From Swiss-Prot:
GO terms for biological process: heart development; regulation of transcription by RNA polymerase II. It comes from Xenopus laevis (African clawed frog). Induction: By bone morphogenetic proteins BMP-2 and BMP-4. Keywords: Developmental protein, DNA-binding, Nucleus, Transcription, Transcription regulation. GO terms for molecular function: DNA-binding transcription factor activity, RNA polymerase II-specific; protein dimerization activity; RNA polymerase II transcription regulatory region sequence-specific DNA binding. Residues 61-94, 155-184 are annotated as: Disordered. The keyword Nucleus applies. It is found in: Nucleus; Nucleus, Nucleolus. This is Heart- and neural crest derivatives-expressed protein 1. Residues 80-132 form the bHLH domain. Highly expressed in the adult heart and expressed at lower levels in the intestine and gall bladder.
Length: 197
């Protein structure tokens, strides 16, 4: 909002305003003194047009008690937050966030100070489910299984955007890795990218 706008200084020791010395400038000016000082007409909505502080019908100056209603109405319009979500949307967001917090607690071996995004939480949960499926599949085999590891490493943005070779997803297992029984592909690949050091 332009507070300086068309505010005119009437100090004689400063630069003179040509309007002060014009022949038609007696008691009343053509424009109200404070018009544009508080509100610029271009910044006010059409619901609240800028009106002069005097009533041309009666020739009387309008007092503050008569204009305060207009200012309060304008303040109410400008004071309201734009885009404030409704209660239903806030409750939905809180519900989703609490569900993600509960899901994060279910993933083992994640340090307490680690912040996980929603997508990382979903990927880790998917990988953990895959791990549990492998444990169930290997349960009948002698020898036991490894414990679940949730060591999180940071992956730089460039590596994340690079397309992954399809050979690692569906084809032969990379050298040094054994091919897992049952569910293979995406969850194990995500687990390898997100967690393994």
């Amino acid at each position: 909002m332009n507070l300086i706008g068309s505010y005119q200084h009437h100090h004689h020791h400063m630069m003179p305003d040509p309007f002060i010395f014009s022949p038609g400038s007696r008691c009343h000016q053509e424009r109200p003194y404070f018009q544009g000082w508080v509100l610029n007409p271009g910044e006010v909505s059409p619901e609240f047009p800028a009106q002069p502080p005097y009533s041309p019908e009666y020739g009387a100056v309008v007092g503050p008690s008569q204009t305060s209603g207009r200012i309060e109405n304008l303040g109410g319009k400008l004071g309201r937050r734009k885009g404030a979500p409704p209660k239903k949307e806030r409750r939905r967001t809180e519900s989703i966030n609490s569900a993600f917090a509960e899901l994060r607690e279910c993933i083992p071996n994640v340090p307490a100070d680690t912040k996980l995004s929603k997508i990382k939480t979903l990927r880790l949960a998917t990988s953990y489910i895959g791990y549990l499926m492998d444990v169930l599949a290997k349960d009948s085999e002698p020898g036991g299984t490894e414990a679940f590891k949730a060591e999180i490493k940071k992956v730089d943005g460039k590596r994340r955007r690079e397309p992954q070779p399809t050979e690692g997803y569906w084809g032969a297992a990379p050298a040094g890795e054994k091919k897992l029984k049952g569910r293979t592909g995406w969850p194990q690949q995500v687990w390898a990218l997100e967690l393994n050091p």
